[in-house]
Amino acid sequence: MTNLKEVTFEKPSYDQWQEAAVKQLKGKPFESLLTKTIEGITLEPLYTEERLLEALDGKLEEQVSTVRALKADGDFGVAQQAFGSSIEEFVAQTNDAFARGAQYVTVGKVSFEWDEAALKQLAALIDTHKQVVLYVDNKEVVNVFNFVTDKTVTGFIVSAEPVELTDFANVRTLNAHTQTVHYEGANATQELAIALAQAAELLGEDFAANEDKFFASFAIDPQFFMEIAKIRAFRVLWKAFAQAYGVTSPKPVQIVTETSLRSFSKLDVYVNLLRAGNEAFSAVIGGADVVTVHPHNVLTGPTNQSVRIARNAALVIKEESHVTKVLDPAGGSYFVESLTHDLVKNAWAYFLEIQATGGYTAAQAKIAADVKVVWDKRLADVETRKAVLVGTNNFADATEEVPAESFVDVNRLAQPFEKLRVDFKENPVKVAVLAYGELKKIKPRTDFVTGIFATAGVTADVTEPFTDVEAAKNYLATTDAQVVVFSAVDEDVEAVLPQIIASKQPGTLLDVAGKFDIDGIDGALYAGMNIYEKLEGIQTSLKEVQR
């Protein structure tokens, strides 16, 4: 009898694995397993130690050690924003947050004015709790330091504009602020390069003199592994950046993060919980020093409950995941290390392009143009469902209305579909799906059609499946629906649809489910199409008919 402890298995090579994978693809090319990210990085289906070492030219250990050397420890600070309709409510929320695990007095957008009385109460909070993060939405809030008496408080002033602050040596004010370009559409490569370009201007000629005042801030997207790699890559880039100043051993660089609102939606807002939790976890694993989790309903106005849930998302990661017990928990992952390397290489190249243009300020036109290309690609991916916003461009609830309230206004990918809902509510459209054939065969196409209209807040009426051409003609001739979509299997589309087109009433739009080109129809709904343009086009066409 064979002793299982003595059984050995031959380790297959990458080529052997690839050969086996191709056989399973049943005629599809191996390249179908590759995925290109919006950064232009090609994701492989398998990462191995050998291929990683080859890609890094044997410098894997150097990359890992750099990431770890430039992170002070494995912990992170919970910076949960307080809101409130008054300074008194803001103070109460902040004190409650500290009692429940928050570590920074965190200020962002509020719905009251920062007058002298409010600033004095905020200053008292900072004196009490000793740590502060100011997300500068209103420049007046920076004046709080005129009233802070404890000059040893620590913290960060997160601002797109440089802030001068004397007497507070432990408050960092030189911020490589990438949130602005993030909301303009920038990808991870661009954010990293722009952070370096900003750092070059902020630090000037004397790296050592300004190092203790510098930090970088990033908004973290839902692309889990890419965002982990983004934070790690910045530390590798920071070492190279410091070496350009002749500093071989820079101090750990501080990184402040906030969950991104770029993928947030006013629709199906509880999905924002998942987005924010995912983003927060990737920030922590990537090595963020400070994490702010935005409430799921921050777009329309946060509540005490949503603020508590957001804070608890960070606290659960901090207290229950144990990732803070490890320095650089993602280190050594072939996939993450490969992504980190690709981002470092590409971001440094783009940084040099910016510097060749004259630096960050001089390169504003170039940066804006480059970032717009990426934003347009992001929008196109959402509008064609290549990228899915659950509850917004797919799996949407047709009965949900877009809240009119607006508390935070940033560039978001969901906005076109939110606008569609408003348009279709103001100009209602009756849509019917003319089902033809056996139900179980046509249901996938029918559901696809109803799902598309649901993204605009339209509940499409689906007929009982017809099996008789004359009955289908009669329905088309008598329906009060303004838009009718014919849904059937391919054979029935080609055989039946041409026979019933003539029965269409004037002013009725007749479309087909599936990518067909048939004379007499107004259009088609199919996978991969730009559903936003299609739905917007329906509105435009019906308005023209009404005129």
Residue positions per predicted region:
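Catalytic alpha/beta active-site cores
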Residues: 1-223, 302, 439, 443, ...
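Generic hydrophobic alpha-helical scaffold/packing signal
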Residues: 314, 337-340, 344, 351, ...
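A short beta-alpha structural unit
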Residues: 298, 333-338, 433-439, 472
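Active-site capping/gating regions of soluble enzymes
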Residues: 217-249, 254-403, 527-533
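Intrinsic disorder at enzyme termini
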Residues: 7, 28-29, 34-35, 44-46, ...
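Active-site lining segments that contact anionic ligands and/or coordinate catalytic metals
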Residues: 213, 250-252, 288-290, 348-351, ...
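Structured core elements
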Residues: 42, 79, 106, 133, ...
